[in-house]
Structures are given as C-alpha cells and as structure tokens.
Amino acid sequence: MREVISINVGQAGCQIGNACWELYSLEHGIKPDGHLEDGLSKPKGGEEGFSTFFHETGYGKFVPRAIYVDLEPNVIDEVRNGPYKDLFHPEQLISGKEDAANNYARGHYTVGREILGDVLDRIRKLADQCDGLQGFLFTHSLGGGTGSGLGSLLLEELSAEYGKKSKLEFAVYPAPQVSTSVVEPYNTVLTTHTTLEHADCTFMVDNEAIYDMCKRNLDIPRPSFANLNNLIAQVVSSVTASLRFDGSLNVDLNEFQTNLVPYPRIHFPLVSYSPVLSKSKAFHESNSVSEITNACFEPGNQMVKCDPRDGKYMATCLLYRGDVVTRDVQRAVEQVKNKKTVQLVDWCPTGFKIGICYEPPTATPNSQLATVDRAVCMLSNTTSIAEAWKRIDRKFDLMYAKRAFVHWYVGEGMEEGEFTEAREDLAALERDYIEVGADSYAEEEEF
C-alpha cells in the first residue's frame, strides 16, 4: 500500500478539501455516509488505488485519510453539519476558538501553536493506520492567516518528524478580484520563505486565473468561492487520479518530484487543465486529444496568470484521463513540439512525460462543469511562473517601505527581521528562475 494523508488547513484549504472529497467519493462510488453505492461490491479504482486515499473500517465503511484544521470553528462546523458529516471521523475535524485574523504571526506563533499538539497527534494516528505512508498532500491558501501561518508551521513539523516522506502542496495564490485582506502579500512572502525548504512540490492555484476561467468558459458572471473550488477540485482530482486509479505515470508522490523538479527550490510547476466547459457548450465541442493538448499551452487554461510564451519549459507531464489512445497523444505532442511558441531550456531533454488514466472525469451534480469523455491536466515547470513572484514581491515592497501593518505581526511575537529575511529569500528565488532560464552555452562563453 502507498497511502497519502490529505491535510486541509484554513478556510480555503477546508473548502477546497470539501469539493475534493465530494468528487473523490463520486469517482470511487462511495456515498456521503461512507458506504458503497448500491450494486457495488468494492469501490471503483481497484484495491490498491482507492486505499491510497480511503481507509476501510471493520464495518465496511470507507473513511478519508484526511484532516481538516482551522483556527475558527465556522468552516469546519459546516463539514460537521453538512451532507458529508458521516464520511469523516469526528476527530479528523479540528477547530479552534479564535481565528488568525489574516495574520501569519498569529497562525505561526501564537494561536496556531496552541492547537499544534492536537493536530500532530491526529496525524500520527492516521499514519499508524498506513502500511506504507508515501507522503502528505496539503491544501491551504498563501494569503490567509491560518493557511499561511499554521500551514507553514505544520510543514516544518512534518519535515522534522517524517523527513523522508513527500510533501506536496496545493497553494492558493491571492488575487485582487477575490481578495479578503490587505496583508495578503505579507502572508504570502512569509509563508513561501518558511516552506521553501520543506515542501517538495507546490502546485499554485491563482484565484484570478480561476476566476477568469469561470467567467469565460463557464459563463458565470460573478463566480463564487464554491464555483472556484469546484474547478480547483477537478484539477486536484486529475493530478491525484494516477495515485487513486491504476495508471502508468506518477503512480507515487516521489515521481512528481523526479519528473518535475530539476533543483530543490524550483519546485513550483504550472498547472493547466482542459477542457473547462459549461454544460450548455459541451455538446458542441469535439474535444479531440490534439485540441485539449494544444489548449493546455494557452495562457487561458492555466491556473496561474503568467505567459509561458515568455519563459522556457524545463519539464512537462501530461496527465490524460478517459477515452484516450496513446497514438493520438504522441501525435498531439509532436504537433506541440513543432510549434515555435513552446521554448524548452537547452540543458534539458525535450521529453514530455505522458500518463494515461482510463477512468473518465466526473463532475459533481451542483457543479457548472460539463461531464466530458476525456480531459488532460498538464504540469509544467516553466520559468514564466516567476512572474507570479514578481507581482507579489512588488506589492510587499510598496507596503513594507512604509512599514504598514507591521506592528500587528511584531505584536504577536514575530521579529521585524523576519520580513527582510523572507523578502531576500524571494528575491533569490526570482534570480534562481532567471539563471535556470539562461542558455547554458551563453554561460560557457563567459569562462
């Protein structure tokens, strides 16, 4: 067995977790109470597959290997009283009494630290149920207080306790359209600095990019968080499908790092997903393999706002789902390689890693997304994602030049030096991206 424990931290993490577990349950044929759908003798996905994410109890009930953590009770109370309340073990839902007030320092040093012991105990219990734990899957936001502060604190602790296990993150990057607080740039820079050496691979999800996709592709005039989360859940499901169903590529978490991370700090692959279609448009689209593959290289299908045509690709994984034939995939990849718009770094072989999972994508009943025969999720490590860091660093600098809001952080026991240290680390990260994008033959000429 190669089990994965999911950890959802903060409001965004917990709400994305809800959307994901609803989707996983549908995909594996598990009802909201944790029992199998009528007519099924075992969950879909094969014995090996589903048990990476679900644990079977002695009573034939399936319980997610997941933990929800938030410093204020509202979001987790919705899970406790919602349609999936019987799916989760009550001890897996951990909430505090007062929130982090959008303050990284409260989540990391004061309020978050009080709840840390309980969370780690619960993670140990889940880990004890596993025969061969392969790692952890985090979902949290970078801009909130709990997601950034407690999220990074947990990652640090897990690094110390489970050093060799993989730690993958789905991190929500802040955006002006759905911004909830003015200090998001501070929280983002501080948490990125703290987790840079602890996370093995971080898939960033930019709220602005998802917001635009919902408006453009799903015809939702003013997308809500629920709309955004349904789309994010589809992406998370596609990335984890090869772990949960029998697939040929990225069958375990280590493989993501091996395929996508050329240097430990450059671990932020860009995620693209296609097709994103509303139910009304689905019947008018053919969605051939070459169409959905080409769409992944278009900026409009990316989860982070940046232009890959300005950067270079270091590594690419294409994860297909559904009715897909290898020959069509090879042809589609050849077409992409022949295009002049896709630039690859010259020090890396031009291989595109391909994975095919024959289980087609599913859409939840209340989602705006259409159910399609095939879909593709592309994970690509490209230098253009550095644009996202540039944007947030610029916002950080504008506020920090005036030392705006800094007293709230210092008041929670944080030292002001941490701000400059974190900012310098992100400046170094921006430089790292420039260096890996530079042509190696240009460097050789300098010597």
Swiss-Prot record:
GTP binds at Q11, E72, S141, G145, T146, T180, N207, N229. This is Tubulin alpha-1 chain. The active site is at E255. The keyword Transferase does not apply. InterPro entries: Alpha_tubulin, Tub_FtsZ_C, Tubulin, Tubulin/FtsZ-like_C, Tubulin/FtsZ_2-layer-sand-dom, Tubulin/FtsZ_GTPase_sf, Tubulin_C, Tubulin_CS. Dimer of alpha and beta chains. A typical microtubule is a hollow water-filled tube with an outer diameter of 25 nm and an inner diameter of 15 nM. Alpha-beta heterodimers associate head-to-tail to form protofilaments running lengthwise along the microtubule wall with the beta-tubulin subunit facing the microtubule plus end conferring a structural polarity. Microtubules usually have 13 protofilaments but different protofilament numbers can be found in some organisms and specialized cells. It is an enzyme of class 3 (hydrolase). Present with 5590 molecules/cell in log phase SD medium. CDD domains: alpha_tubulin (cd02186). GO terms for molecular function: GTP binding; hydrolase activity; metal ion binding; structural constituent of cytoskeleton. Keywords: Cytoplasm, Cytoskeleton, GTP-binding, Hydrolase, Magnesium, Metal-binding, Microtubule, Nucleotide-binding. The keyword Coiled coil does not apply. The lineage of its organism: Eukaryota, Fungi, Dikarya, Ascomycota, Saccharomycotina. Tubulin is the major constituent of microtubules, a cylinder consisting of laterally associated linear protofilaments composed of alpha- and beta-tubulin heterodimers. Microtubules grow by the addition of GTP-tubulin dimers to the microtubule end, where a stabilizing cap forms. Below the cap, tubulin dimers are in GDP-bound state, owing to GTPase activity of alpha-tubulin. Its cofactor is Mg(2+).
